Amino acid sequence: MKPTNYHLFDFMDFDVDLSKNESLWKAYKPTSVCEKGGDVHVVVPFQKQVLANDMAADVATPKEEYTLILRQYSNNIIRLFCGFGEYEMTDNSEMLQFSERIQQLPLHVKAEDGGWTILSADGVRRAYINVKAPVLDHWSDLLPEPQETLDVVLYPDGKKEVRLAAYDHFSPPRYDALPLAYCVKDGNKERATLSFECKADECFAGTGERFTKMDLSGHTFFLKNQDGQGVNNRRTYKNIPFYLSSRMYGTFYHTCAHSKLSLADVSTRSVEFLSDQAMIDAFVIAGDSMEEILRGYRDLTGYPSMPPLWSFGIWMSRMTYFSADEVQEICDRMRAEHYPCDVIHLDTGWFRTDWLCEWKFNDERFPDPEGFIHGLKDKGYRVSLWQLPYVAEEAEQIDEARANDYIAPLTKQQDSEGSNFSALDYAGTIDFTYPKATEWYKGLLKQLLDMGVVCIKTDFGENIHMDAKYKGMKPELLNNLYALLYQKAAYEVTKDVTGDGIVWARAAWAGCQRYPLHWGGDSCSSWDGLAGSLKGGLHFGLSGFAFWSHDVPGFHTLPNFMNSVVDDKVYMRWTQFGVFSSHMRYHGTNKREPWHYPAIASMIKKWWKLRYYLLPYLVEQSQKATQSGYAVLRALIFAHPADKVCWHIDDEYYFGDDFLVAPVMNSDDCRDIYLPEGNWVNFFTGEHFKGGQWLYGVKVPLEEMPVYVREGACIPVYPEDVDCTDEMDLSKVTHLCIDDSFKGVWK
């Protein structure tokens, strides 16, 4: 359908010809406000609309009343809930995991002339509900009077004002946003919308792994997980129904329904949310820092757990290793040539047939998998395995899975997409809404973990079979939530068997941050693939996630997806980015081992050793991230939300508290660098710089990277070369002091 540039069609999803049996119901001003169980209940009438290109009240149809509930948590979070029909407010949700900091604060109502003020017990104003008539200087009857509206101002922390978009219209019939409304189709309530005012200069970030510029204003996002098929488009593996505002608040929409989020786009003066569920459940979180807001989000949805030490070492993989002998040869060479490495990952080739996931080793190419795994462990390597949450028609488990409904029964045959990269090419999706199916899946993984495998790559999970009957919910609601249920199952059984909670996951939704870690999907081995990956990682860190990785040096090649050669400079610059990432894994469609790039192999080894040198710092910063709102990779706005320049920088980042990293993402070995406030020291040259300035046209030799460390920082480091983390004795950790005596890390 071609865009119309009208809210009713482009955002609210009504057909242009209005041929369907659909109606829109708009919120009017409240009729009563009262206290109930510590909450405030606001009775709101909704008026059906006569729809054309415009909207007008259908006065022949009686209004319907619904209750808008306001609930205050702690000192900076206010919750708005309005269920249309059968929906009720609940904390019983896979997405929610309240911390002990989430305490409900009773709210009180103070009636005033023209409205109600909502106060917490300490007398702090938390909301104001306005029903005063607008001030008019009446001189014309040319246009109809505007309809009533819902005018509510929220003060989540008692200071910051977040207002519903009560008056976002042109003439009275021409609306660009609605404060609160719902839709009815064929007699069923189907969609709901909530809108907040935004300011002309307001900026936004977050919403998941978003492969676009830092400031998201002027964009509308469809929050539906799907295979991103790269990192340079609007698709994404990881949608998170949460955004951050430069006005120092964030909003978490508690839903797993397919949704739209317009950030000053459909209307440039509103943030608009549309859910395919006839319910609004929004948590508005205010704070004095980005970290405080994100900590509030984690207080609601859960904190990341701490990955094991070995996971911070280097992972080596490709798509794919096909035999134990091949893996042994590669691992032995890395040890002989002292390329430090901790994890060897087996992708799609360890099964009976490539890509045919049966959760069993090929008994010809891996004749003794347990001995193979333990032999690698003796050399300091852990083994990670690829798999996916679908069962193929040819898999040996298919009859058992069908007979017991471990895969959701299809309601109709779906067309294959003719690719290994699609859920539709499998016979069914494992039904994680069904406890017996979850336990069956855990049993498949347990057999592998009992052999000594330490990590399961929980690939895919963005797409499910939509024409299927799942035990616990409709596929339209399960689609986004599926990643959480899938990763939770793999994480739990891994932790139960090995003691270490970890997965290697691609998809995500709200709550998935509890089950680290996630990587950025199938990027192209190119400069734009590198740039898109970093953008996605920065927004992901602004969406509640602490840990994130990416395929070094990109996953696929161009023009030939599997067989084009990766450029040496791309390999080198992406390696540098990987060293300064929370986790570092080499992976892709062709060879990734450094000796296949002989011109730069010695430089690569030097950078790998730098990674292990910095592991104590990385572990320190990771522990901090699991107890706060911080990510390991942080966009500059994390620390400088008031610096308008930082809202437009998506190619630099903080690595923990003390490192400022500016990857080179071109073949010219040159870039501009913004130094935010503070005093900075070049990590490789020892040169000192004052912050708050641009460095233009900085030339960067291939063996170096623009990395700056805070003046006065004291960085914990490991002083000895090691081949893996098993060789580390953490009592030997020393500190690198960034003072006048520091002349560069390699000097």
Positions of PLM-derived features:
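Active-site-proximal structural scaffolding
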Residues: 63, 235-236, 244, 273-275, ...
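Catalytic core of carbohydrate-active enzymes
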Residues: 491-496, 500-501, 508-519, 532, ...
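Generic recognition of flexible, low-complexity loop/linker segments
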Residues: 56-57, 67-68, 228-231, 238-240, ...
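N-terminal accessory segment at the very beginning of proteins
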Residues: 1-310, 319, 326, 331-332, ...
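Aromatic- and carboxylate-enriched substrate-binding clefts and catalytic-loop regions
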Residues: 83-86, 95, 174-175, 181-184, ...
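Structural beta-strand/beta-sheet cores of well-ordered domains, especially the beta-sheet scaffolds
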Residues: 66, 114, 238-240, 247-249, ...
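A conserved hydrophobic secondary-structure block that centers on an alpha-helix together
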Residues: 228, 232-233, 317-366
